[in-house]
Every structure is written in C-alpha cells, then in structure tokens.
Amino acid sequence: MLTVYNTLTRQKETFKPLEEGRVKMYVCGPTVYNYIHIGNARSAIAFDTIRRYLEYRGYQVDYVSNFTDVDDKMIKAANAENITVPELADRYITAFKEDTKALNIEPATLNPRATDNIEEIVAFIQDLIAKDYAYAVDGDVYYRARKFKAYGHLAGQDLDQLEQGASEHTATEETLRKEDPIDFALWKAEKGNEIAWESPWGKGRPGWHIECSVMSTKYLGDTIDIHGGGQDLEFPHHENEIAQSEAKTGQTFVNYWLHNGFVTVGDDDQKMSKSLGNFVTVHDLIQEVNPQALRFLMSSTQYRRPIRYSQSLLAEAQTNLDRLKTTLDNLAFRQPTAEPGEDQIVMDKAAELEAAFVTAMDDDFNVQNGLTQLYELAKLSNQYLEQPTVQSDTLTSLATRLTRLLAIFGVVFKADQLLDTEVESLIEERQAARAAKDFAKSDAIRDQLKAQGIILEDTPQGMRWRRA
C-alpha cells in the first residue's frame, strides 16, 4: 500500500488516485532564463523517479511540467543579452531538454509554455474578477488573498504576519494600489517596451502564479492527484495556485502536495541557488563527469530530505554504478556456459528482496531503504556467480530484476560496443603470447589495451573484456 507525505496535511496518507490505475501529476518546471543548476535538476530527478516508480507499480502517469517563458527574470535576462524574451526562452528550453536527456529524465507527457496559453490565462482572470476574487487597478489585476478563507494553510502562514511582511517588502506605490498588502498580481500592466499582450485591462503580461493554475487545470482537469515542486515553492507560489484555482472551480485543486528538499553545498550546508552564486550548472558539470553519476547521486536520497553535493559524493555514486554494472556484465558473461534450469533458493531470495524494495518505496518513496534492497540483490548475484556451475534461468532472473529496479532510478547501462579490428588483433596477439609463455609481451599488450580503455580479465571461464 503506497503512502505519500502530503504537505497540505503534514502527514503521510494512503495514495488513492482519482481514477484507478491512472495518475494526474503536475510539476512546476523551470523559468527558462539560464541553464539549470544542480538544485533545479534535483527537483526534476526526484519527480522523475517518483513517476518511474508509479509506472513500475502499474499506473499510467499523465505528467505535465511547464516552462515559465515570461516573467521579470526573463525580461531582465533578455535585455542584458540584447535579445527578445522568446529568443531567450527558445535557447534555454533547448538547453533544458539537452540537460534532462543527458540525465535520462523521461520527457513529460506535455511541456506547455505560459506564452502559448495567454488566451486561457486572460479568461481565467476574468472569471476570478466576476467571482469578486480579483480586481483591476490601472491595468494591473490583483487577487484578494484574504477573501480565500484557506489562504496560508498549505505553508502554515499567519495572515497578520504576511500583511506585515508584505508591507515591508512591497514598493510603496504598489502597496497603495492594492486593497490589502497580501494581495498578489494576476496580470501586470505593460511597462516601457516589455513584452505584452492585449487584455481587457490593457496591454500587459501574466503573473507567475496564474500561469501554473491555468496550465495544470487546462491539461489535467480541475482536480489533480499530485502536484510537485521544490520546498521553496510552497509559499507563495503553490499557496497562490490553490487560492486561484479553487476560487475559480469550487473544487479541490490538488489531492497530494509533494515538495522536494534542497541541494546543499559546503561545510555549512548552504542551499544551492543562483541568488547566492554557489551553484553549478548541469550544462557545465556533465562536460566533466558522467551524467549518470549525477543522476544516481540525486536519486539516492528520499525526495523530502536535503542532498549535500560534493565531488567526493559524486565519485562515490560513480563507484556504486561501476560495481552494479560489473555485476550485470558478469551475469551476462556467464550465460553462454550456464546449465539449463534454475536455483530455486536463489530465485526465492531475489523475489523477497524485490518485495522488500517495494515495501520501502511504498513508504513515501524511501529510496535509501529501497537502494539497500537493490544492493542486497547485487550482493546475492555476486555470491551466486562465485559458484563454479550456474543455471541460465537464474542468471536471467537476477539480471532482469536488477535492470528493472535500476531503471526506476534512471540507470540504464549501455551495452559495450564491439571491439574494432585493431583491438581484436591485439587480443589475438596477446593470447598467442600467453600460449608461448611470453608473459612480458602479454602484459605489454594488456597495458596497451588498457590505455585505449579496454580492460582484459582472465577468469576460470575464459578471457573477457570490458570498457574502463
């Protein structure tokens, strides 16, 4: 029985989707004004892992993740580079797709762009005005936050404290235009030569919060199963999404709110962020390291907990991947000489370990405990491989289970390419040298192959090779 921690209720709840066998899932995507950093990638990876596990459990997942392609940051960045906002968006949407592909993040069912939904955004705001939840002032439109009785509930915010904070951090001119300091913008009037669209209130552009309300309800319906995002989005973004959406539809907006923890760096575990300047972009990092190692590191901690990023932890993730790949390679290597049949004791133990994996993951996607079972499955496989005689069905079963569970973490090992003619010739030459007991030459050829990234291993079952 799958349980998830619901931020709205601050407790674990049994997961029951609106439609049996199908999950509607919306995850806030990036504001595409720059390359994503590792902290941004953590959110994408965490919810991709959750999605993959739901699919493993037999659910069809309708997964929508948006692109925020117009807001203050977009305008500022476009002006700095002397290009248009759409040009900036196109550049970094392409970069995002390249980065997430390298991290083996499954493409979303839909990746809507805010600017493709302006007509729906305007209609949504008009509906809120008609219901007296919003009001227009000099081309801007604001939401009456206090009118929504549950405002502040998601993030546990007190309205009086919010009023004081809003008054301290909002420009005096804007505060005077608002009916209440905690009201927030749904539509922003055009300023200067900013990108803008026609609306009943004059030319302008949407506020950030309204974009996600419109896109999630448009593509997934008035009520969705799971809404995900980083913990920094709880307030005000997700709080405002609830207020907007439920005021318009009169329905529960989201049944389960899931929020991932931050990526931290340094001895003081400081949150990684662009504003603090302590970030590393995925684009730069994957030029230097195996993207799969970064993916595995980001997948190895339960999604609600913070993850510390460091080069040593990244190297540890790569070591763990190498060991798992070696296990799978060894299972494949023994297959041609395996006897027919199966070892029922080993098969039963493997089934128990996969069942324990499911139990762990069913507890709010507890990947740490899940990985413990996966490593035990790899250990069982290695112990079985030590036997002089192995059975083909058992090898296949072990490899299939390992591959299936690793895929939940986005780990898919590519088959080694065939050796080219030159390397094949060197291997034959080495075998001839060994037969002639010319071990110095044999070792020299081995070292030459190693320099080309080919590792030779002499085993009781014969010589085998693998790429370093």
Curated annotation (Swiss-Prot):
SMART domains with a match to the protein in the record: DALR_2
CDD domains xref list: CysRS_core
Renumbered ranges of motif 'KMSKS' region: 271-275
Binding-site list for ATP: K274
Cofactor: binding details: Binds 1 zinc ion per subunit.
Highest taxon in the source lineage: Bacteria
Motif ('HIGH' region): 30-40
Chief location bin: cytoplasm
Catalysed reactions listed for this entry: tRNA(Cys) + L-cysteine + ATP = L-cysteinyl-tRNA(Cys) + AMP + diphosphate
One Pfam family, short name: tRNA-synt_1e
GO cellular component: cytosol
UniProt-recorded Gene Ontology molecular function terms: ATP binding; cysteine-tRNA ligase activity; zinc ion binding
Keyword terms of this UniProt record: Aminoacyl-tRNA synthetase, ATP-binding, Cytoplasm, Ligase, Metal-binding, Nucleotide-binding, Protein biosynthesis, Zinc
Cell compartment(s), UniProt: Cytoplasm
Disulphide bond pairs: none
CC cofactor: Zn(2+)
Protein name, entry field: Cysteine--tRNA ligase
Organism: Latilactobacillus sakei subsp. sakei (strain 23K) (Lactobacillus sakei subsp. sakei)
